[in-house]
């Protein structure tokens, strides 16, 4: 089991996030299992990600000056980061991601675990 670490005002389970913004991910558990989408944002304090097109919720908007009619809109709700996995669009299947070192430039790059190719 992962050790809980203190970050800011809350405890978080994950220190490193292998999934980044604009990555394509696939949901591996829950009612959205098997669906894919692009990561819109990451909440590191709560270990959650917002994925485009997944976990949609209805939000009731009051009339404002910008939106005088108000109404109901659908927005994406956050999903726990353990419920999503990186999706490789080239191979069209899910793939693990690990951080490796690039020897030429000496900086960190992300590589796909099965084929060791840069992402």
Swiss-Prot record:
Note the superkingdom of the native organism: Bacteria
Q: One biological process GO term for this chain?
A: translation
* CDD domains, A to Z: KOW_RPL26
- Which SMART domains does the record match to this protein? KOW
GO cellular-component terms in the record?
Answer: ribonucleoprotein complex; ribosome
Disulfide bond positions: none
Q: Which GO terms describe its molecular function?
A: rRNA binding; structural constituent of ribosome
> Keywords assigned by UniProt?
Ribonucleoprotein, Ribosomal protein, RNA-binding, rRNA-binding
NCBIfam families, A to Z: rplX_bact (TIGR01079)
The task this protein performs is described as: One of two assembly initiator proteins, it binds directly to the 5'-end of the 23S rRNA, where it nucleates assembly of the 50S subunit. One of the proteins that surrounds the polypeptide exit tunnel on the outside of the subunit.
- How does this polypeptide assemble, per the annotation? Part of the 50S ribosomal subunit.
Q: Write the protein's name.
A: Large ribosomal subunit protein uL24
**Which organism does this sequence originate in?**
Leptospira interrogans serogroup Icterohaemorrhagiae serovar copenhageni (strain Fiocruz L1-130)
């Amino acid at each position: 089991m992962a050790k809980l670490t203190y970050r800011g005002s809350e405890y978080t389970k994950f220190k490193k996030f292998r999934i980044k913004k604009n990555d394509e991910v696939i949901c591996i558990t829950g009612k959205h299992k098997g669906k894919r989408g692009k990561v819109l944002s990451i909440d590191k304090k709560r270990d959650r990600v917002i994925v485009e097109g997944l976990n949609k919720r209805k939000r009731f908007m009051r009339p404002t000056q910008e939106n005088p009619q108000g109404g109901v809109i659908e927005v994406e709700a956050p999903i726990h980061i353990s419920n999503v996995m990186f999706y490789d669009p080239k191979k069209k299947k899910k793939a693990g991601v690990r951080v490796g070192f690039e020897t030429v430039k000496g900086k960190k790059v992300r590589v796909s675990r099965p084929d060791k190719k840069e992402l």
